[in-house]
């Protein structure tokens, strides 16, 4: 059993909420935080009770004021920078769990450009496009510094693709990688340019 070096941020309100729930369970019960399908677009985070007999040797323990959180070693890197809060609104209170790295593990600053761009697409750009039922996939980065993107879902064949690409996605990528990326291209435009002379 390892002690975690980095804690998941659990707000005081959320800790109090967990303590109240744990008081109704058998003594020695703590919580487990996990990710189902980690590293995929379908990743889901969850919290469950963790009775004393459910702690695994390979689990990582994070100690809080009145309880511990146990995390399996597979989920751990995907829960980096995760935050749990208990928010009270007019309609009642709810637990919120934000895990920006659940769908994709955080990449190092010195990772290859394609990995860093892919990480930004999965964690920042695709969540915005998901509101419109769309998503983009990074196909390659050309030698002259263009990210070649494929639009899928609701974006595919949509007349707004050019606007979305040029105004939103391209600006965002170039501003994040100013010295490495010159711009972005839609794969259909990229292929059309390459194959139009046959």
Swiss-Prot record:
Top-level taxon in the UniProt lineage: Bacteria
Keyword annotations: 4Fe-4S, Iron, Iron-sulfur, Metal-binding
UniProt entry tagged with the keyword Transmembrane: no
UniProt GO molecular function: 4 iron, 4 sulfur cluster binding; iron ion binding
GO BP terms: iron-sulfur cluster assembly; protein maturation
Cofactor binding, per record: Binds 1 [4Fe-4S] cluster per subunit. The cluster is presumably bound at the interface of two monomers.
Claim: Ribosomal protein is one of the keywords in the record: no
Coiled coil: none
Gene3D superfamilies: Fe-S cluster assembly (FSCA), HesB-like domain
Binding residue positions for [4Fe-4S] cluster: 155, 158
Named cofactor requirement(s): [4Fe-4S] cluster
InterPro entries reported for this sequence: Fe/S_biogenesis_protein_NfuA, FeS_biogenesis, FSCA_dom_sf, HesB-like_dom_sf, NIF_FeS_clus_asmbl_NifU_C
Family: Belongs to the NfuA family.
Subunit structure: Homodimer.
Function noted in UniProt: Involved in iron-sulfur cluster biogenesis. Binds a 4Fe-4S cluster, can transfer this cluster to apoproteins, and thereby intervenes in the maturation of Fe/S proteins. Could also act as a scaffold/chaperone for damaged Fe/S proteins.
Protein name as it appears in the record: Fe/S biogenesis protein NfuA
């Amino acid at each position: 059993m390892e002690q975690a070096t980095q804690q998941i941020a659990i707000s005081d309100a959320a800790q109090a909420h967990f303590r109240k729930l744990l008081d109704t369970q058998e003594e020695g019960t703590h919580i487990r935080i996990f990710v189902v399908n980690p590293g995929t677009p379908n990743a889901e985070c969850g919290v469950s009770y963790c009775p004393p007999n459910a702690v695994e040797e390979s689990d990582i323990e994070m100690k809080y004021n009145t309880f511990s959180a146990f995390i399996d070693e597979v989920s751990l890197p995907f829960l980096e920078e995760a935050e749990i809060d208990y928010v009270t609104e007019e309609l009642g209170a709810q637990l919120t769990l934000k895990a920006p790295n659940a769908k994709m593990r955080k990449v190092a600053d010195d990772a290859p450009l394609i990995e860093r761009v892919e990480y930004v697409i999965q964690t920042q750009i695709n969540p915005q496009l998901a509101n419109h039922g769309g998503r983009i996939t990074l196909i390659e980065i050309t030698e002259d510094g263009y990210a070649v993107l494929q639009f899928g879902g609701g974006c595919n064949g949509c007349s707004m693709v050019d606007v979305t690409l040029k105004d939103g996605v391209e600006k965002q990528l170039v501003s994040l990688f100013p010295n490495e990326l010159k711009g972005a291209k839609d794969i259909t435009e990229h292929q059309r340019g390459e194959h139009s002379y046959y």
